[in-house]
Protein backbone atom coordinates (compact mmCIF):
# COMPACT_ATOMS: atom_id res chain seq x y z
CA UNK A 1 0.00 0.00 0.00
CA UNK A 2 2.71 2.48 1.02
CA UNK A 3 4.96 1.42 -1.85
CA UNK A 4 2.16 1.84 -4.38
CA UNK A 5 1.48 5.31 -3.00
CA UNK A 6 5.17 6.25 -3.28
CA UNK A 7 5.30 4.89 -6.83
CA UNK A 8 2.44 7.20 -7.79
CA UNK A 9 3.97 10.07 -5.84
CA UNK A 10 7.26 9.67 -7.75
CA UNK A 11 5.52 10.18 -11.09
CA UNK A 12 6.84 13.49 -12.53
CA UNK A 13 3.25 14.68 -12.91
CA UNK A 14 3.07 14.76 -9.11
CA UNK A 15 6.70 14.88 -8.01
CA UNK A 16 7.66 17.90 -10.13
CA UNK A 17 5.04 20.25 -8.62
CA UNK A 18 5.79 18.78 -5.20
CA UNK A 19 9.53 19.40 -5.58
CA UNK A 20 8.80 22.95 -6.75
CA UNK A 21 6.65 23.61 -3.68
CA UNK A 22 9.31 22.15 -1.37
CA UNK A 23 11.93 24.30 -3.09
CA UNK A 24 9.91 27.46 -2.44
CA UNK A 25 9.33 26.47 1.19
CA UNK A 26 13.03 25.70 1.64
CA UNK A 27 14.02 29.26 0.78
CA UNK A 28 11.02 30.86 2.45
CA UNK A 29 11.98 29.21 5.75
CA UNK A 30 15.70 28.95 5.10
CA UNK A 31 16.57 30.07 8.62
CA UNK A 32 14.73 27.06 9.99
CA UNK A 33 16.07 24.67 7.35
CA UNK A 34 19.59 25.99 7.84
CA UNK A 35 19.94 24.77 11.42
CA UNK A 36 21.87 21.82 12.81
CA UNK A 37 18.74 20.54 14.50
CA UNK A 38 16.94 20.33 11.16
CA UNK A 39 19.91 18.53 9.60
CA UNK A 40 19.97 15.93 12.38
CA UNK A 41 16.25 15.19 12.17
CA UNK A 42 16.28 15.18 8.38
CA UNK A 43 19.24 12.78 8.34
CA UNK A 44 17.66 10.41 10.86
CA UNK A 45 14.33 10.31 9.02
CA UNK A 46 16.03 9.95 5.61
CA UNK A 47 18.24 7.09 6.79
CA UNK A 48 15.25 5.31 8.33
CA UNK A 49 13.20 5.67 5.13
CA UNK A 50 16.16 4.64 2.97
CA UNK A 51 16.81 1.56 5.12
CA UNK A 52 13.17 0.55 4.86
CA UNK A 53 13.19 1.13 1.07
CA UNK A 54 16.28 -1.07 0.66
CA UNK A 55 14.23 -4.05 1.84
CA UNK A 56 12.48 -3.92 -1.54
CA UNK A 57 14.44 -5.88 -4.20
CA UNK A 58 13.40 -3.58 -7.05
CA UNK A 59 14.53 -0.44 -5.23
CA UNK A 60 17.77 -2.08 -4.14
CA UNK A 61 18.55 -3.25 -7.68
CA UNK A 62 18.18 0.30 -9.02
CA UNK A 63 20.26 1.88 -6.26
CA UNK A 64 23.08 -0.69 -6.45
CA UNK A 65 23.35 -0.70 -10.22
CA UNK A 66 27.04 0.26 -10.75
CA UNK A 67 26.22 3.17 -13.06
CA UNK A 68 23.71 4.58 -10.56
CA UNK A 69 25.86 4.53 -7.42
CA UNK A 70 27.69 7.79 -8.30
CA UNK A 71 24.32 9.50 -8.73
CA UNK A 72 23.26 8.30 -5.28
CA UNK A 73 26.47 9.78 -3.82
CA UNK A 74 25.86 12.97 -5.80
CA UNK A 75 22.37 13.33 -4.31
CA UNK A 76 23.67 12.91 -0.75
CA UNK A 77 26.48 15.44 -1.29
CA UNK A 78 24.11 17.86 -2.99
CA UNK A 79 21.66 17.76 -0.09
CA UNK A 80 24.44 18.36 2.44
CA UNK A 81 26.08 21.27 0.62
CA UNK A 82 22.71 22.86 -0.09
CA UNK A 83 21.97 22.72 3.64
CA UNK A 84 25.46 24.07 4.41
CA UNK A 85 24.88 27.11 2.19
CA UNK A 86 21.57 27.83 3.94
CA UNK A 87 23.19 27.31 7.33
CA UNK A 88 25.96 29.82 6.66
CA UNK A 89 23.61 32.24 4.90
CA UNK A 90 21.26 32.17 7.89
CA UNK A 91 24.08 32.99 10.31
CA UNK A 92 25.44 35.82 8.16
CA UNK A 93 22.01 37.36 7.57
CA UNK A 94 21.37 37.43 11.30
CA UNK A 95 24.77 39.04 11.91
CA UNK A 96 24.17 41.67 9.22
CA UNK A 97 20.73 42.51 10.65
CA UNK A 98 22.38 42.97 14.04
CA UNK A 99 24.87 45.44 12.53
CA UNK A 100 27.79 43.01 12.55
CA UNK A 101 29.94 41.84 9.64
CA UNK A 102 29.63 38.41 7.98
CA UNK A 103 31.72 35.61 9.44
CA UNK A 104 33.92 35.62 6.34
CA UNK A 105 34.86 39.25 7.09
CA UNK A 106 36.05 38.64 10.66
CA UNK A 107 39.82 38.89 11.30
CA UNK A 108 40.07 35.18 12.13
CA UNK A 109 38.56 34.17 8.78
CA UNK A 110 40.64 36.67 6.81
CA UNK A 111 43.93 35.33 8.12
CA UNK A 112 46.23 34.34 5.25
CA UNK A 113 48.26 31.12 5.09
CA UNK A 114 51.20 30.09 2.93
CA UNK A 115 50.56 28.23 -0.31
CA UNK A 116 53.53 26.00 0.58
CA UNK A 117 53.18 23.79 2.52
CA UNK A 118 49.57 24.41 3.66
CA UNK A 119 47.73 24.30 0.33
CA UNK A 120 50.09 21.92 -1.48
CA UNK A 121 49.99 19.33 1.30
CA UNK A 122 46.20 19.52 1.48
CA UNK A 123 45.90 18.97 -2.27
CA UNK A 124 48.42 16.10 -2.13
CA UNK A 125 46.44 14.29 0.56
CA UNK A 126 43.23 14.88 -1.41
CA UNK A 127 44.80 13.36 -4.55
CA UNK A 128 46.01 10.31 -2.62
CA UNK A 129 42.62 9.84 -0.97
CA UNK A 130 40.73 10.12 -4.28
CA UNK A 131 43.13 7.69 -5.97
CA UNK A 132 42.64 5.09 -3.24
CA UNK A 133 38.89 5.60 -3.39
CA UNK A 134 38.77 5.11 -7.18
CA UNK A 135 40.97 2.00 -7.03
CA UNK A 136 38.72 0.41 -4.40
CA UNK A 137 35.67 1.46 -6.41
CA UNK A 138 37.00 -0.18 -9.57
CA UNK A 139 37.68 -3.43 -7.69
CA UNK A 140 34.38 -3.66 -5.80
CA UNK A 141 31.89 -2.49 -8.44
CA UNK A 142 31.80 -4.20 -11.80
CA UNK A 143 31.56 -1.51 -14.44
CA UNK A 144 34.02 -2.64 -17.14
CA UNK A 145 34.42 -1.40 -20.68
CA UNK A 146 32.02 -3.32 -22.86
CA UNK A 147 32.51 -4.71 -26.35
CA UNK A 148 32.52 -2.41 -29.40
CA UNK A 149 29.14 -0.96 -30.30
CA UNK A 150 26.92 -3.28 -32.30
CA UNK A 151 24.85 -1.39 -34.92
CA UNK A 152 22.29 -4.21 -35.00
CA UNK A 153 21.52 -4.10 -31.28
CA UNK A 154 20.65 -1.27 -28.90
CA UNK A 155 20.33 -1.49 -25.12
CA UNK A 156 16.93 -0.92 -23.58
CA UNK A 157 16.80 1.49 -21.88
CA UNK A 158 19.42 3.40 -23.86
CA UNK A 159 20.56 6.15 -21.51
CA UNK A 160 23.01 8.97 -22.02
CA UNK A 161 25.79 9.59 -19.47
CA UNK A 162 24.32 10.88 -16.21
CA UNK A 163 25.36 14.48 -16.88
CA UNK A 164 23.28 14.42 -20.10
CA UNK A 165 20.25 12.67 -18.64
CA UNK A 166 18.62 16.02 -17.96
CA UNK A 167 18.77 16.77 -21.68
CA UNK A 168 17.49 13.30 -22.52
CA UNK A 169 14.53 13.85 -20.20
CA UNK A 170 13.83 17.14 -21.99
CA UNK A 171 13.43 15.15 -25.22
CA UNK A 172 10.15 13.86 -23.79
CA UNK A 173 8.74 17.38 -24.06
CA UNK A 174 10.75 19.02 -26.87
CA UNK A 175 12.13 18.19 -30.30
CA UNK A 176 15.85 17.26 -30.47
CA UNK A 177 16.82 20.64 -31.95
CA UNK A 178 15.27 22.37 -28.94
CA UNK A 179 16.25 19.97 -26.14
CA UNK A 180 19.67 19.11 -27.56
CA UNK A 181 20.77 22.43 -29.05
CA UNK A 182 18.77 25.53 -28.10
CA UNK A 183 18.22 24.85 -24.39
CA UNK A 184 21.86 23.76 -23.74
CA UNK A 185 23.07 26.90 -25.55
CA UNK A 186 20.76 29.03 -23.41
CA UNK A 187 22.15 27.34 -20.30
CA UNK A 188 25.75 28.03 -21.35
CA UNK A 189 25.02 31.61 -22.42
CA UNK A 190 23.09 32.23 -19.21
CA UNK A 191 25.96 30.98 -17.06
CA UNK A 192 28.42 33.18 -18.96
CA UNK A 193 26.16 36.23 -18.81
CA UNK A 194 25.22 35.87 -15.15
CA UNK A 195 28.21 37.78 -13.68
CA UNK A 196 27.52 40.68 -16.05
CA UNK A 197 23.77 40.71 -15.47
CA UNK A 198 23.87 41.07 -11.69
CA UNK A 199 24.95 44.55 -10.61
CA UNK A 200 24.25 43.94 -6.93
CA UNK A 201 27.58 44.46 -5.10
CA UNK A 202 26.37 42.67 -1.97
CA UNK A 203 26.96 39.02 -1.25
CA UNK A 204 30.40 38.79 -2.85
CA UNK A 205 32.78 36.62 -0.84
CA UNK A 206 30.33 35.53 1.84
CA UNK A 207 27.19 33.44 2.22
CA UNK A 208 23.89 35.31 2.21
CA UNK A 209 20.35 34.99 0.96
CA UNK A 210 18.59 38.10 2.23
CA UNK A 211 20.82 40.38 0.14
CA UNK A 212 20.51 38.41 -3.12
CA UNK A 213 17.11 36.73 -2.98
CA UNK A 214 16.10 36.96 -6.65
CA UNK A 215 19.44 35.90 -8.12
CA UNK A 216 19.94 32.97 -5.74
CA UNK A 217 16.33 31.81 -6.02
CA UNK A 218 16.26 31.79 -9.84
CA UNK A 219 19.68 30.18 -10.21
CA UNK A 220 18.93 27.53 -7.59
CA UNK A 221 15.58 26.70 -9.19
CA UNK A 222 17.23 26.15 -12.55
CA UNK A 223 20.00 24.07 -11.00
CA UNK A 224 18.11 21.96 -8.47
CA UNK A 225 14.64 21.57 -10.01
CA UNK A 226 15.17 21.93 -13.76
CA UNK A 227 18.48 20.07 -13.91
CA UNK A 228 19.25 17.82 -10.92
CA UNK A 229 15.64 16.66 -10.58
CA UNK A 230 15.55 15.67 -14.26
CA UNK A 231 18.82 13.75 -13.84
CA UNK A 232 17.34 11.85 -10.88
CA UNK A 233 14.20 11.05 -12.87
CA UNK A 234 16.22 9.88 -15.86
CA UNK A 235 18.55 7.77 -13.70
CA UNK A 236 16.21 6.04 -11.28
CA UNK A 237 12.69 6.38 -12.69
CA UNK A 238 13.07 5.83 -16.44
CA UNK A 239 13.19 2.21 -17.53
CA UNK A 240 12.74 0.24 -20.77
CA UNK A 241 11.37 2.28 -23.69
CA UNK A 242 11.95 5.37 -21.53
CA UNK A 243 8.75 4.54 -19.68
CA UNK A 244 8.24 5.82 -16.15
CA UNK A 245 8.64 3.26 -13.36
CA UNK A 246 8.18 3.93 -9.67
CA UNK A 247 11.11 3.33 -7.30
CA UNK A 248 9.51 0.07 -6.07
CA UNK A 249 8.15 -1.05 -9.44
CA UNK A 250 9.53 -3.98 -11.41
CA UNK A 251 10.98 -2.98 -14.79
CA UNK A 252 8.64 -4.88 -17.09
CA UNK A 253 9.85 -4.63 -20.69
CA UNK A 254 6.31 -5.23 -21.91
CA UNK A 255 4.75 -2.34 -20.00
CA UNK A 256 2.65 -0.19 -22.32
CA UNK A 257 1.45 3.30 -21.43
CA UNK A 258 -1.32 4.69 -23.63
CA UNK A 259 -0.69 8.32 -24.58
CA UNK A 260 -2.56 10.48 -27.06
CA UNK A 261 -0.67 13.73 -27.44
CA UNK A 262 -2.32 16.51 -29.43
CA UNK A 263 -0.89 19.65 -31.05
CA UNK A 264 -2.27 23.08 -30.23
CA UNK A 265 -3.49 23.48 -33.82
CA UNK A 266 -5.59 20.31 -33.43
CA UNK A 267 -7.02 21.62 -30.17
CA UNK A 268 -7.88 24.94 -31.81
CA UNK A 269 -9.35 23.87 -35.16
CA UNK A 270 -10.67 20.34 -34.60
CA UNK A 271 -11.74 20.25 -30.94
CA UNK A 272 -12.79 23.87 -30.37
CA UNK A 273 -14.02 24.98 -33.83
CA UNK A 274 -15.04 21.51 -35.01
CA UNK A 275 -13.48 21.97 -38.43
CA UNK A 276 -10.67 20.43 -40.45
CA UNK A 277 -7.12 21.67 -40.24
CA UNK A 278 -6.43 24.46 -42.79
CA UNK A 279 -4.22 23.44 -45.69
CA UNK A 280 -2.06 26.54 -45.34
CA UNK A 281 0.75 25.83 -42.88
CA UNK A 282 0.87 29.28 -41.31
CA UNK A 283 -2.89 29.55 -40.95
CA UNK A 284 -2.94 26.09 -39.38
CA UNK A 285 -0.26 27.01 -36.85
CA UNK A 286 -1.48 30.58 -36.31
CA UNK A 287 -2.69 29.90 -32.71
CA UNK A 288 0.71 28.53 -31.69
CA UNK A 289 2.55 31.38 -33.40
CA UNK A 290 0.41 33.92 -31.53
CA UNK A 291 0.88 32.19 -28.16
CA UNK A 292 4.65 31.88 -28.66
CA UNK A 293 4.92 35.49 -29.84
CA UNK A 294 3.00 36.81 -26.85
CA UNK A 295 5.13 34.73 -24.48
CA UNK A 296 8.47 35.75 -25.96
CA UNK A 297 7.87 39.34 -27.08
CA UNK A 298 4.79 40.80 -25.34
CA UNK A 299 5.44 39.57 -21.79
CA UNK A 300 8.85 41.31 -21.48
CA UNK A 301 7.29 44.66 -22.42
CA UNK A 302 4.26 44.11 -20.20
CA UNK A 303 6.50 43.26 -17.24
CA UNK A 304 8.36 46.56 -17.76
CA UNK A 305 5.35 48.51 -16.50
CA UNK A 306 4.99 46.58 -13.26
CA UNK A 307 6.61 47.85 -10.07
CA UNK A 308 9.06 44.94 -10.06
CA UNK A 309 9.95 45.56 -13.70
CA UNK A 310 10.56 49.27 -13.15
CA UNK A 311 12.72 48.49 -10.14
CA UNK A 312 14.69 45.95 -12.16
CA UNK A 313 15.28 48.40 -15.02
CA UNK A 314 16.47 51.09 -12.62
CA UNK A 315 18.97 48.64 -11.20
CA UNK A 316 20.41 46.98 -14.32
CA UNK A 317 19.29 49.07 -17.33
CA UNK A 318 17.31 48.19 -20.44
CA UNK A 319 19.89 46.01 -22.23
CA UNK A 320 20.52 43.79 -19.22
CA UNK A 321 16.79 43.70 -18.54
CA UNK A 322 15.85 42.29 -21.94
CA UNK A 323 18.70 39.76 -21.91
CA UNK A 324 17.70 38.64 -18.42
CA UNK A 325 14.01 38.31 -19.32
CA UNK A 326 14.87 36.41 -22.51
CA UNK A 327 16.96 33.89 -20.55
CA UNK A 328 14.36 33.63 -17.77
CA UNK A 329 11.54 32.96 -20.24
CA UNK A 330 13.68 30.34 -21.95
CA UNK A 331 14.26 28.63 -18.61
CA UNK A 332 10.59 28.78 -17.65
CA UNK A 333 9.53 27.33 -21.00
CA UNK A 334 10.63 23.90 -19.76
CA UNK A 335 8.30 23.63 -16.72
CA UNK A 336 5.48 25.30 -18.68
CA UNK A 337 5.77 22.75 -21.49
CA UNK A 338 5.94 19.91 -18.97
CA UNK A 339 2.77 21.06 -17.22
CA UNK A 340 0.94 21.50 -20.54
CA UNK A 341 1.89 17.96 -21.55
CA UNK A 342 0.68 16.51 -18.24
CA UNK A 343 -2.58 18.45 -18.00
CA UNK A 344 -3.70 18.61 -21.64
CA UNK A 345 -1.50 16.03 -23.43
CA UNK A 346 -0.20 18.96 -25.49
CA UNK A 347 2.61 17.85 -27.78
CA UNK A 348 3.60 20.99 -29.72
CA UNK A 349 2.56 24.62 -29.65
CA UNK A 350 3.81 24.94 -33.22
CA UNK A 351 3.99 21.80 -35.37
CA UNK A 352 5.59 22.35 -38.77
CA UNK A 353 7.04 18.99 -39.82
CA UNK A 354 7.24 20.38 -43.37
CA UNK A 355 10.12 22.57 -42.15
CA UNK A 356 11.22 20.21 -39.35
CA UNK A 357 10.18 22.96 -36.94
CA UNK A 358 8.27 21.80 -33.89
CA UNK A 359 8.05 23.84 -30.70
Annotated model-derived regions:
Residues 1, 7-57, 67-92, 106, ...:
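Hydrophobic cores of alpha-helical transmembrane segments in multi-pass integral membrane proteins
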Residues 62:
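Conserved P-loop NTPase catalytic core
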Residues 96-107:
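Extended, regular secondary-structure scaffolds
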Amino acid sequence: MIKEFLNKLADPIISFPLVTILFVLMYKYYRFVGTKKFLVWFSVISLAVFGWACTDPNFLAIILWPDNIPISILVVMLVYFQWLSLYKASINDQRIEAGDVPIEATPEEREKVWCWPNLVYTELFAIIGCTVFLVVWAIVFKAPLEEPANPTWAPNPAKAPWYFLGLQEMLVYFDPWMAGVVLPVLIIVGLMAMPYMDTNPKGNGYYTFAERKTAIFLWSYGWLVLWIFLIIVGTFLRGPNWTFYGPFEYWDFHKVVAENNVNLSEFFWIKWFNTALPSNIFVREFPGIVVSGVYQFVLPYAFMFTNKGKELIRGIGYIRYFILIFLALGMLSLPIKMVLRWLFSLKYLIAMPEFELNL
